Amino acid sequence: MPSLSQPFRLATLPKIASLSNFSLQADYVQVADGTFNESTNNITLGISGSSISQYIINPTPKLTFDYPIPSTNIITACNAEKGQANIDGNIEASTDDEANNEKTINTQKKRNVEIWAFGLMVNKGNYTLNVITKALEDTTDTSNDHLSESDIDNKAYTGSDEFLSQYKIKAKAKVMSIKIDTKNSLVIAILQNGLIEIFDFKLTLLHSFDISYDNLKYAKWFTENGTEYVFVLCPLQDDKVCYKLLELTDCGSGESSPIKELSSTIIEGFSFENSKLCYQFGKLYKLNQGKIYIYSLPHCQLQQVIEFPMVDKLSPGDDLISFQPVSVNRVLLTVNNVIYLLDLLHCSTLSQRELTHVKTFQLLKSAVINSEKSHNSKTIAIGISTKNGPNPTSSLEIINIDVGTNTLKDSLGKSFQVGNNDSSVILKPLFDDKDINDKRVKCNDVSGDSSVPVLHCNEVIEKLSALQDNDITSFDDIFFKELKIKEEHYTEKDRYISDPGFLNKVLDLIFGKFSGNDYPKTLTFLLTHPLFPLSRTRNLLSLLRDQPRLFKQAIVTCPNLPLNELLEELFSIRNRELLLDISFRILQDFTRDSIKQEMKKLSKLDVQNFIEFITSGGEDSSPECFNPSQSTQLFQLLSLVLDSIGLFSLEGALLENLTLYIDKQVEIAERNTELWNLIDTKGFQHGFASSTFDNGTSQKRALPTYTMEYLDI
């Protein structure tokens, strides 16, 4: 179930000049992307004017490592990654000559390290890029008493050393984004002047790529099918922005640049200033003036605009807003001290929490998870909280998040969209003007001559009671004509029939006047009514068992059917179609725990008969008779049956059939997975291959000229 926990404190921010402006704290505290995920226990942050710090979360939040920086330095970008790197070192080794001289030998040793890279701004126009190599705490070196030139263990670097290496260079412009590639030992810095520079871990410049714009404001790296991509946004005049998509290719391709431009587009009406941006799973989200604009990649086309009622009346400068993604179509939004978990697909507020102990809470970073492809629905986010009072203090706090199941079920009844007040006060007419007659009551408050029907319950009951037994035709004529019902099943136009007492009396007359051989069409209508009386659902299935059409209708549409009766019918029926209907109804209406508890009360013989029917491979029950969705449905129900009774209660022959059935299901799942991966790979290649891959040409071939597109938004 979607939920937001109460945040807990990680550390208190220092009271320094660079952090005195609370509205800019989120820009002056940078969180390293590389090591921040839903299961991390280490968080690396760059705190402007203070230090590059590393904290652990469990069992008790505390500072584990700290690299101080001058109080006048502002951190513009920060990242960290764990991996292996070649560490240089010098040792003194004796030679075999007569003078017994010593010479210095340069050595390299590959070690498990942590790479920290960050950009600093000392003052406007003075920028630096820094790389620190830090030994992991569990890294140890094997000692060797006998040193040789071919196999020398450098004793100078041990697990207790603070840093293995430190490098610093002057940057040509403000560092906006940093990516660390531990596989190829690279640091990729994206600068505000439009340069993308690639360094090794010693900050030796290897490649440089110019995007031709000197006002880069946003850059985001993402991975698709093992390939790294980055898109950048450069604001232009007249609310225009330049969008560029680039690919990071194999860095070992020689002298050619590993950065390749895939597309470039000028987007009009983007309004970059005062906007909050975030990206997840192929979509770019922009929050501006109470509206969120959703752009789809790779062409950055506007897909949807959603209005947020919780932020549309805010005064700029008075309230602090932050915005971060957490899962597919789900984002976190904070307005002052209120946190919202939003579903942008169904426009709903899944959960919200007001932090009464603080004045504001600003999100810094969230760990994005794909809850559609994994069973994990829990993640974390880190932010800055500021307390009330004359001397407010700010703290780093972590919040635990449950994003839910990513289905419509999470959003039912939680929409944040506000309807029109005029249309919500007065009900709209259910019927056209031509249906108005003397038995309708005019609604003068509604524009036109709209009306709603009047329900004369007592008159209808009296007329139905006066009929003779088994007079099906007269019963249906009175019921449908008196109530102005046009269909034999419930529709939205029948909403005015909402009296449970009236429905109960009609059912009493039906079961009292008609035998079990045949029933009027009125019963079909009532079985589709969402207000079917709860008291009448008991023993309803057994009463309708001899009427196949009504029996199936009750299973599919009648609300509030008891679970125990559904299970009894499920374990006694030998019809494939009804078996699927009942199983779908059970899985849809009841929880797994309640199903298992009720199964334990049933006879083991009935349960075994059900398992035998499913796994025996007969004409009506073999896996080949079901489509993939039906087979998955029965497989899920079968797992609940096995959980409730246990495998030890089954006999040998039944276990063999069950094993064969499960093997077939696993084989189908493996085959479907392979096909899905093939389709997914081919689909992605068709999306990007036109400008990225060319199997018939060399990697050194020049890129085709890109096109400029102007979009009217």
Swiss-Prot record:
Keywords: Nucleus, Phosphoprotein, Ribonucleoprotein, Ribosome biogenesis, rRNA processing, Transcription. GO terms for biological process: maturation of SSU-rRNA; maturation of SSU-rRNA from tricistronic rRNA transcript (SSU-rRNA, 5.8S rRNA, LSU-rRNA); positive regulation of transcription by RNA polymerase I; tRNA export from nucleus. InterPro entries: Utp8_b-prop, Utp8_C. The keyword Transcription applies. It is found in: Nucleus, Nucleolus. Signal peptide: none annotated. One of its GO terms (molecular function) is tRNA binding. The modification Phosphothreonine is found at residue 95. The modification Phosphoserine is found at residues 148, 150. Pfam families: Utp8_b_propeller, Utp8_C. GO terms for cellular component: 90S preribosome; nucleolus; rDNA heterochromatin; small-subunit processome; t-UTP complex. Involved in nucleolar processing of pre-18S ribosomal RNA. Also has a role in nuclear tRNA export. It acts between the steps of tRNA maturation/aminoacylation and its subsequent translocation out of the nucleus. Required for optimal pre-ribosomal RNA transcription by RNA polymerase I together with a subset of U3 proteins required for transcription (t-UTPs). Interacts with snoRNA U3. Interacts with MPP10 and UTP25. Component of the ribosomal small subunit (SSU) processome composed of at least 40 protein subunits and snoRNA U3. In the absence of snoRNA3, forms a complex with other t-UTPs. This complex can associate with pre-18S ribosomal RNAs. Present with 16800 molecules/cell in log phase SD medium. This is U3 small nucleolar RNA-associated protein 8. It comes from Saccharomyces cerevisiae (strain ATCC 204508 / S288c) (Baker's yeast). The lineage of its organism: Eukaryota, Fungi, Dikarya, Ascomycota, Saccharomycotina.
